[in-house]
Amino acid sequence: GGYTHAEVMAAMQGYGDAGRLRYAWISPTLDTLFPLIYASFYVGILYRFAPMTRLQGLVYIPILGGVIDLAENAQIVAMLLQYPDISVAQVEWANRFTLTKFIFTRLSMLMAVIVLAFAALQAIHIRWQKRQS
């Protein structure tokens, strides 16, 4: 999965000089906000709704995902600025960061859904018990 050196080189060429510079400028600004926002969102959900205190340690998964996303963005900016001198190894490292980021973001999303579902079921159960008494 992911992308190859040939695909990166073709994309970089397709962007053109102006496109690469624009992308290199946008990535550190806008692409920095997104990981911070989604990591904070998932951390907040996991911290607030984790059913047991020991499960609140799950907050480190979205934090790590956000850090990996930022590292991936740095790799992309480096490739944008170094074009056409992009090594196969650099693309492989960027690809690893991309694939790892996807794993951590999907895992964070799944954990948030599970924790929210558990919290909702718990709230329904508590209300049902109150009606029974």
Model-derived segments and their meaning:
Residues 11-19, 37-50, 75-82:
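Membrane-helix exit/interface motif
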Residues 26-47, 113:
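Hydrophobic alpha-helical transmembrane segments
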Residues 65-120:
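Alpha-helical transmembrane segments of multi-pass integral membrane proteins
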